[in-house]
């Protein structure tokens, strides 16, 4: 028998749902909430009239004081969740995402399921590829500028839109250093020393 003090507990008459995220940016309380068009429940309700849904997050995700990581959801994501108020259906809580056809990331297809990709809606992304004999790490800006570390630990940095700028640099190598370019300029405002 359920004690009277628990009769109105949120878990009573749980109602599950499947829906699609339609708003991720306008939460007035800035709590990371989203609006979800719940299939079969909110079909005829305008997006602006939908209630804000809380999101269940992993314990490694920051929820205060900017600690932890925050990846967030994107509009168009299919989600699974429950209504905390049961049949009233006004307190939605998102528990997880459900992939649907068309959600495949084009960068992930070639090496699926060995690579993990984190991509923002603006096109910035990180990729960790565990494909055997082709392990690599890559981080890329939406402009195309990126750095990549291959399976042997070699690093490539490519700044497509600008020139990399470093305040101080020291280059040491156990072998040969080769500089190749149509024009090579070496300028020193005080001294240029070349020793052999």
Walk through the language-model features, giving the residues of each.
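C-terminal intramolecular chaperone/autoprocessing and neck/assembly modules of extracellular spikes
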Residues: 190-196
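Hydrophobic packing positions characteristic
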Residues: 1-189
């Amino acid at each position: 028998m359920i004690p009277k003090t628990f009769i109105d507990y949120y878990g009573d008459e749980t109602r599950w749902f499947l829906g699609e995220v339609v708003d991720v940016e306008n939460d007035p309380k800035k709590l990371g909430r989203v609006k979800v068009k719940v299939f079969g429940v909110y079909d005829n309700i305008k997006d602006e009239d939908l209630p804000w849904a809380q999101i269940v997050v992993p314990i490694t995700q920051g929820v205060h004081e900017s600690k932890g990581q925050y990846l967030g959801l994107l509009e168009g994501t299919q989600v699974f969740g429950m209504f905390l108020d049961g049949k009233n259906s006004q307190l939605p809580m998102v528990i997880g995402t459900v992939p649907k056809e068309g959600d495949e990331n084009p960068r992930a297809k070639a090496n699926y399921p060995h690579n993990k990709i984190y991509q923002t809606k603006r096109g910035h992304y990180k990729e960790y590829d565990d494909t055997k004999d082709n392990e690599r790490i890559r981080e890329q800006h939406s402009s195309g500028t990126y750095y990549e570390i291959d399976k042997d630990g070699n690093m490539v940095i490519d700044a497509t839109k600008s020139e990399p700028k470093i305040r101080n640099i020291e280059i040491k190598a156990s072998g040969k250093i080769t500089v190749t370019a149509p024009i090579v300029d070496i300028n020193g405002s005080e001294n240029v020393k070349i020793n052999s």
